Amino acid sequence: MKNEKVNVGIVLAGGRSSRFGEPKAFFQDEVTGKTWVELTVSKLLPLCEMVFVSANHENYSKLVTLFDAEPTIEIIPDQTAFSDFGPLGGIYAVMKAAADYQKANFLVLPVDMPFLTSKEIGRLAEYPNHYAKTKRGDHYLVANLPYAREILQSLLHEEEHRVRALLEKCNTKPLIFENEATFRNINHQNELF
């Protein structure tokens, strides 16, 4: 199913990064010199009319400063009531702020998958309401979602924390990708070497 709708990006950059030892969003790539949040945003910008970066209250100001001159990038802080709900809370905060984009597809990427390429993201953009899947597992945070603010709000009020619950409610389907290595989620710095 070819996608003809507007795409909006969501970069999930509000995680605690406790196992990583420093905020993953600001970890600098040795090759490009850019932070992981900058790299993730740069992969979405060619495909998206707007990119929203989901931030926690600790990194919000630094992210605003980093992207201050970019009119197509907006930093969205976690909603206080749902700040401990992980990625689901971040996606909700963005969709609440993105009410003008109710007809858009939302391309969701976590900041800690630095090996994802424009090729995989471009393919995902062609398949509305799908998430990435490889032989080794489901990658629920690499997804092309419909606007789902009401569903998210309901899940959060039920104290649901699982992204999978959102995908089930939206009838989101898996999209198979062959290259496992590009979908590596980095939780420890030693996984980079």
Residue ranges of predicted features:
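Nucleotide and nucleotide-moiety/phosphate-recognizing core
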Residues: 2-139, 147-160, 168-182
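Short, glycine-/aromatic-enriched active-site segment of Class I SAM-dependent methyltransferases
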Residues: 143
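Short, conserved phosphate/pyrophosphate- and ester-handling motifs at nucleotide-, phospho-/glycolipid
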Residues: 146, 188
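Short low-complexity, flexible loop/linker segments enriched in glycine and/or proline
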Residues: 67-68, 190-192
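Short amphipathic alpha-helices within nucleic acid-binding modules
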Residues: 151-152, 191-193
